[in-house]
């Protein structure tokens, strides 16, 4: 049965697959486009399964913001070549929009969400693997919301607002403080803090750090009072490195982030950090 060009074109538009695959699927399904789509989805599953043991270490992070909530979505691929592909960029952007629209708070919720006429998001990922020829993986989602205030964010990159690292911040304020929030999010991206405040630090890790410093200071053979001041000073330096509120503001190192927040008449309630290499908070 000879297939007309309009059917082949429609099938290619709907699946993103090549001419020969679409033509063959239509021939096998007697020109029925719906059946051909299902057939190609089955082929896509098979192709994706063959790539499942590959390592997807590149990729992109996309952000989508609403007034009082926001999401960061990370999709991995194998190479920078695919990460810069327009179809991959569109896929990642669409997933962030869907996650925001559906208020997805977990990967499972997003994977099971509807994706255009492809089916679910997970099926769109599988289809993308088939079309782009690399393993694609929807690997992380960060969701942040606030009841009284705004969510602001920043993604560092140069690909249509997508990038390799992103942050969300929740601000409690009475007015529009998006620019303030964006500046804090940019700081989070640059400095990668491990906790919002000292109280939020992992206690076991904190105790271990103090023990190491105390052992280092003990070898100096200083009087007890002097040794305690040295330990406290080194701990303060440690807090500056890993605690957001204690860090020096990247735009003005004469003040801490806590000082910048106070001067801006806002309260920083929480933050999220997502990076391509897996580090996140």
From Swiss-Prot:
InterPro entries in the record: EF-Ts_dimer_sf, Transl_elong_EFTs/EF1B, Transl_elong_EFTs/EF1B_dimer, Transl_elong_Ts_CS, UBA-like_sf
Record keywords: Cytoplasm, Elongation factor, Protein biosynthesis
GO molecular function list: translation elongation factor activity
Region (Involved in Mg(2+) ion dislocation from EF-Tu): 79-82
Cell compartments where the protein resides: Cytoplasm
A GO CC term assigned to this protein in UniProt: cytoplasm
Principal place of residence: cytoplasm
Signal peptide positions on this chain: none
Disulfide bonds: none
Pfam families documented for this protein: EF_TS
Family: Belongs to the EF-Ts family.
Cross-referenced PANTHER family: ELONGATION FACTOR TS, ELONGATION FACTOR TS, MITOCHONDRIAL
Function: Associates with the EF-Tu.GDP complex and induces the exchange of GDP to GTP. It remains bound to the aminoacyl-tRNA.EF-Tu.GTP complex up to the GTP hydrolysis stage on the ribosome.
Name of the featured protein: Elongation factor Ts
Source species: Wolbachia pipientis subsp. Culex pipiens (strain wPip)
């Amino acid at each position: 049965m000879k297939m007309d060009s309009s059917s082949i074109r429609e099938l290619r538009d709907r699946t993103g697959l090549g001419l020969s695959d679409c033509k063959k699927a239509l021939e096998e399904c007697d020109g029925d486009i719906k059946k051909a789509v299902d057939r190609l989805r089955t082929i896509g599953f098979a192709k994706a399964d063959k790539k499942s043991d590959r390592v997807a270490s590149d990729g992109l992070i996309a952000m989508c913001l609403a007034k009082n909530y926001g999401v960061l979505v990370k999709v991995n691929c194998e190479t920078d070549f695919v990460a810069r592909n327009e179809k991959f960029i569109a896929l990642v952007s669409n997933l962030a929009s869907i996650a925001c629209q559906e208020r997805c708070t977990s990967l499972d919720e997003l994977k099971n969400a509807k994706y255009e006429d492809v089916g679910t998001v997970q099926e769109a990922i599988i289809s993308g693997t088939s079309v782009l020829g690399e393993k694609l993986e929807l690997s992380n989602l960060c969701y942040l919301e606030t009841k009284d205030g705004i969510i602001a964010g920043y993604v560092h990159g140069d690909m249509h607002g997508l990038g390799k690292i992103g942050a969300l911040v929740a601000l409690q304020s009475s007015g529009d403080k998006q620019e303030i929030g964006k500046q804090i999010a940019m700081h989070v991206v640059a400095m990668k803090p491990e906790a919002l405040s000292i109280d939020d630090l992992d206690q076991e890790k904190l105790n271990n750090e103090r023990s190491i410093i105390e052992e280092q200071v003990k070898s100096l053979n200083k009087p007890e009072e002097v040794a305690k001041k040295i330990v406290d000073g080194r701990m303060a330096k440690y807090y500056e490195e890993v605690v957001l509120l204690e860090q020096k503001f990247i735009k003005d190192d004469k003040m801490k982030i806590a000082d910048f927040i106070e001067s801006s008449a806002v309260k920083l309630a929480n933050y999220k950090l997502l990076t391509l290499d897996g580090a996140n908070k």
